Curated annotation (Swiss-Prot):
Keywords: Cytoplasm, GTP-binding, Nucleotide-binding, Protein biosynthesis. GO terms for molecular function: GTP binding; GTPase activity; guanosine tetraphosphate binding; translation release factor activity, codon nonspecific; translation release factor activity, codon specific. The lineage of its organism: Bacteria, Pseudomonadati, Pseudomonadota, Gammaproteobacteria, Alteromonadales. GTP binds at residues 18-25, 86-90, 140-143. Residues 9-277 form the tr-type G domain. Increases the formation of ribosomal termination complexes and stimulates activities of RF-1 and RF-2. It binds guanine nucleotides and has strong preference for UGA stop codons. It may interact directly with the ribosome. The stimulation of RF-1 and RF-2 is significantly reduced by GTP and GDP, but not by GMP. Pfam families: EF-G_D2 (PF22042), GTP_EFTU (PF00009), RF3_C (PF16658). This is Peptide chain release factor 3. It comes from the Bacteria. One of its GO terms (biological process) is regulation of translational termination. Belongs to the TRAFAC class translation factor GTPase superfamily. Classic translation factor GTPase family. PrfC subfamily. Coiled coil: none annotated. It is found in: Cytoplasm. The keyword Mitochondrion does not apply.
Length: 526
């Protein structure tokens, strides 16, 4: 087996998806703790003490306690090398989260057992369905008062249309939470509260019928045995093939805050989650084992380091090997670039990379020439597909407090739009800058970042825009006529793509009727 093949086999690249406040950032901390990446997990609760969660590093995130940008963290666990992509949990950041899900091979779904399946989880699961991504489930907060675990598993099956296979099962809940039974290993791990910040010495009892169990947890032992009979009747057996097709999810229980049950889930993930999978391009399918390098950019993050005022393009390597100083082709521009200083991340802490393999995420320094969706190869002119832009759902006009800063405003907005934080439209008929987003919080982020990173003081005004559509037409003359006729409603986006800005949905319908040869797109591939 070649060194490259060995390296590919080691890798597991996954993202965590959940509804806000289900405990995603906490579980990220604990996963890193097990990966020895953090000695003491900086729980999100310790905000006032200045001990911020490692994966929430942007100013606004530190203030609010929400993960806005996607962090990437790599750590070793169980003879595997795990790449964890932390996605924004806040519902206003669905586009960024969506794109991150194009860069992973599996997902960990975190569910708050007190609340069950929530809206955001449903939306994210729809996205994973597009590529049938394998899903592992962690039922969180068992040390709180929660709903009946069986009921929540039924809800997952019914709402998310995925079979559940219980791998572990909780003993008690809330204040009476006693531990976890591992169904496949036939062993009980006993829970001790107050030790969430460290890796605990495990107290394990072998065998469900061990009399030791009755001694330690009393009547809970009989309750557990009864429950497990019900579970074996109602739950599905774990089937690796169904899991890899995205049809069945292994379910683990625990408490991320109490750092309990997380290791069971990690064991399952490293054992069952797929190694780097093949990827489609416009020409062919690329496998991770191929020797020649290829990768695509799924995110651009501005100013990760205020000291460096730079931008980093996050690239998922799909095949081959990155080596320091290597040449690669940037397909969109058909030009060769030498990459001498790619970085890996530990959420804001960087280290330079000597080599990286398929499944790894590396950061390229970007001075404006790299865009989301860019493909880099060893020379082949192919493009990875499936990294979409969505038409925004909310719009604002942006105004300067100081008119002399117009140039800085334009530069800042174009950079932020290339990064995918927001979409920018410049109408044909005036000098307005219209900003489009998927949620309100994105607007706040943009104003704050314009201020701190570009020294531009800007405010928003309401604007009557219902939606935007990208316009294309195969016939150049028809397109030119359309531009003349509909100029009042047309704009260019940040990438200079022609866009129809509709004041109402009725207006859009009429425009589509009157211009049957023009295609109005609600999504656009990067």
């Amino acid at each position: 087996m070649s060194v490259q093949q060995q390296q590919v086999d080691l890798r597991r690249t996954f993202a965590i998806i959940s509804h806000p406040d289900a405990g995603k950032t906490t579980i990220t901390e604990k996963v890193l703790l097990f990966g020895q990446a953090l000695q003491r997990a900086g729980t999100v609760k310790g905000k006032k003490s200045g001990q911020h969660a490692k994966s929430d590093w942007m100013e606004m995130e530190k203030e609010r306690g929400i993960s806005i940008t996607t962090s990437v963290m790599q750590f070793p666990y169980n003879d595997c090398l795990v790449n964890l992509l932390d996605t924004p949990g806040h519902e206003d950041f669905s586009e960024d989260t969506y794109r991150t899900l194009t860069a992973v091979d599996s997902c960990l779904m975190v569910i708050d057992v007190a609340k069950g399946v929530e809206a955001r989880t449903v939306k994210l699961m729809e996205v994973t369905r597009l590529r049938d991504t394998p899903i592992i489930t962690f039922m969180n907060k068992m040390d709180r008062d929660v709903r009946d675990p069986m009921e929540v598993m039924d809800e997952v099956e019914e709402v998310l249309k995925i079979k559940c296979a219980a791998i572990t099962w909780p003993i008690g809940m809330g204040k009476e939470f006693k531990g976890i039974y591992h169904i496949l290993d036939d062993e009980i791990t006993l829970y001790q509260s107050g030790l969430g910040h460290m890796i605990q010495e495990k107290r394990v009892i072998k065998g469900l019928n061990n009399p030791e169990l009755d001694k330690i947890i009393g009547n809970y032992a009989d309750d557990l045995r009864e429950e497990l009979e019900l579970v074996s009747g109602a739950s599905h057996d774990f089937n690796l093939e169904e899991f890899l097709k995205g049809e069945l999810t292994p379910v683990f229980f625990g408490t991320a805050l109490g750092n309990f049950g997380v290791d069971h889930m990690l064991d399952g993930l490293t054992k069952w989650a797929p190694k780097p999978l093949p990827r489609k391009t416009d020409l062919r399918e690329v496998t991770a084992e191929e020797e020649k390098f290829s990768g695509f950019v799924f995110k651009i993050q501005a100013n990760m380091d205020p000291k460096h005022r730079d931008r980093i393009a996050f690239m998922r390597i799909c095949s081959g090997k990155y080596e320091k100083g290597m040449k690669m082709k940037q397909v969109r521009l058909a030009k060769d670039v030498k990459i001498a200083d790619a970085v890996t991340f530990m959420a804001g802490d960087r280290s330079n990379v000597e080599e990286a393999f398929a499944g790894d995420i590396i950061g390229l320094h970007n001075h404006g020439s790299i865009q989301i969706g860019d493909t880099f190869t060893a020379g082949e002119m192919m493009k990875f597909s499936g990294i979409p832009n969505f038409a925004p759902e909310m719009f604002r006009r942006i105004r300067l407090r100081d008119p002399l800063k117009a140039k800085q405003l334009q530069k800042g907005l174009i950079q932020l739009s290339e990064e995918g934080a927001v979409q920018v439209f410049r109408p044909f008929i005036n000098n307005d800058m219209i900003v489009g987003a998927v949620g309100v919080l994105q607007f706040e982020v943009v104003v704050q970042r314009l201020k701190t990173e570009y020294k531009v003081d800007a405010i928003y005004e309401a604007i009557s825009v219902a939606t935007a559509r990208w316009c294309t037409c195969d016939d150049e003359r028809t397109l030119e006529q359309f531009k003349k006729k509909s100029g009042d409603y047309l704009a260019l986006d940040g990438g200079n793509n022609l866009t129809y800005i509709a004041p109402t949905m009725v207006n859009l319908s009429l425009a589509q009727e009157r211009n049957p040869d023009i295609v109005f797109h609600s999504t656009r591939e990067h």
